[in-house]
A protein has these predicted regions:
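Short coil/turn segments at alpha/beta junctions that flank glycine-rich nucleotide-binding fingerprints
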Residues: 93, 109-113
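C-terminal "cap" of GNAT-fold acetyltransferases
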Residues: 20, 113-116, 120-158
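Acetyl-CoA-dependent GNAT
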Residues: 5-82, 87-89, 100-102, 106, ...
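Extreme N-terminal starter segment of soluble prokaryotic enzymes
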Residues: 1-3
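Active-site acidic-Proline motif in GNAT/NAT acetyltransferases
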Residues: 87-93, 121-122
Length: 158
């Protein structure tokens, strides 16, 4: 298994994988990451200062990823942990922890002091992982994510 930064040539394979995982998880197609236009161009979306997307690769295939970027329409120091999804074949191996650590370290290096995340009620394993890393539930959405169907909001001080 290898963790690396996303490359332009990853876009097609990554978009297909992310949509497959979202369908498997029963995520609505409207008001979630499923309909994000940037899902088809992850490289371009995260190819800017203060943004980074990491890929998990195993046997020369993309098995998941996670990104960090400034939260749209929020203060300069607030970032969002974004599009953290993994193929079922690699879940339960501690990869989520590795990816959160990579993303949060990048956020700290880039002077963010709060990290926000949205998730779905049925993604209990993900919520437990976020809690383990110090995220706390909040009662309101932040920023302009376009994810009106995501009713679980969490925040962490960095």
């Amino acid at each position: 298994m290898k963790i690396r930064e996303v490359k332009k040539t990853d876009n097609f394979e990554l978009a297909a994988l992310l949509r497959k995982i979202l369908i498997e998880m029963g995520v609505p197609k409207k008001g979630t990451a499923f309909e994000d236009s940037e899902i088809d161009c992850i490289y371009e979306t995260y190819n800017s200062p203060r943004s980074k997307y990491f890929i998990v690769e195993e046997d020369a295939k993309i098995k998941g990823g996670a990104g960090i970027s400034q939260l749209k329409n929020e203060a300069y120091e607030i970032c969002e942990l974004q599009k953290m999804y993994f193929d079922s074949s690699i879940r339960g191996r501690g990869i989520g922890s590795l990816m959160i650590e990579k993303c949060l370290n990048f956020a700290k290096e880039n002077k963010f002091n709060l990290c926000y995340i949205e998730t779905m009620p049925n993604m209990l394993d993900a919520q437990m992982l976020y809690l383990k890393y110090g995220f706390e539930y909040i009662n309101y959405p932040m920023g302009d994510t376009g994810h009106s169907a995501c009713p679980i909001w969490m925040i962490k001080s960095l």
